[in-house]
Amino acid sequence: KSVMINTLLCSLLYRNAPSDLKLILVDPKQVEMAPYQDIPHLLTPVIVEPEKTVSALKWAVNEMERRYTLLADERVRDIKTYNQKVESKGKKIGVQDEAGNVQQVDGGKMPYIVIVIDEMADLMMIAKRDVEALIVRIAQKARAVGIHLVLATQRPSVDVITGLIKANVPARIAFTVASQTDSITILDQAGAEKLLGQGDMLMKTASMPKPKRIQGAWVMDNEVNKITDHLRMQSAPQYNNEIISQPVQLNGKGGVVMDFGNEGGDDMFRDAVNVVVQMRKASTSLLQRKLRIGYSRAARIIEEMEEQGIIGPADGSRPREVLISSVDELDSGA
């Protein structure tokens, strides 16, 4: 499993510049992905804590929704067409917000994002319901906007690879497993229990529903270190601290409580409402442009506006309905 992840990451790093590919790496064991620390492709330092993993998945869902809004604005269907369109316009890729976090501006090129989770079992034990819900949302919708998941586990039980996750992750790889039951859990059929080990695998994808037997490549640790050392010499990573800084409270196998604070007390909340009322539309990208704030802050203000009845709920690519006609209605309670 770990060798396969190293092979996959090295292949991606060889073929993609940091401006084209960003990585979020989750390593509960703290040692498997240590060689990749501080490479320029990382959006955040390698994550080892469950709380930060849930925060990163939550951020990825928000980023997915933001990207769909940008695709709708440009009237394109996927990230490839979007990037071709913005490159033809010659627009910049990103800027830094007031906190120094790198933000992709509206009209800027979108890098692909790959989230790699080295061991799913640890996460599912701590926050199964929320991890499952976030993974399913990303797996269902995020491919068109360039966000991809790589999930790995040494324990392929139904508690870890749930039916919902299986239904939304069509591409699967099985190495040697202990029993026929484990093979069925991964591939929906037996066979992986007969593999020989040392990279011998069965692969199943949406376009290849019948598993195909493949020999995996072997990447040695010193080869990984040479690649990552070279990348670190080229440039430093530009971390986005918002990815892992969202407050999260883990409640075992139950829910995760996201405490965003009272955005009604945000010093820009009233200014944001004024922008929405004047423009008669509401979106995070609009607040980013008009107020020059980061994406996460704009998204939280939009959520608070919806909770207070200032704007209507999201409706696909349609703009949100503005439900008040004046900022004064905030004070009057109308």
Model-derived regions: residue spans:
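Conserved lysine of the Walker
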Residues: K1
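Hydrophobic positions on the alpha1 helix immediately C-terminal to the Walker A/P-loop
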Residues: M4
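P-loop NTPase motor-domain active sites and their immediate coupling elements
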Residues: S11, S19-L21, N62-A334
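P-loop NTPase switch/communication element
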Residues: L13-A56, L164
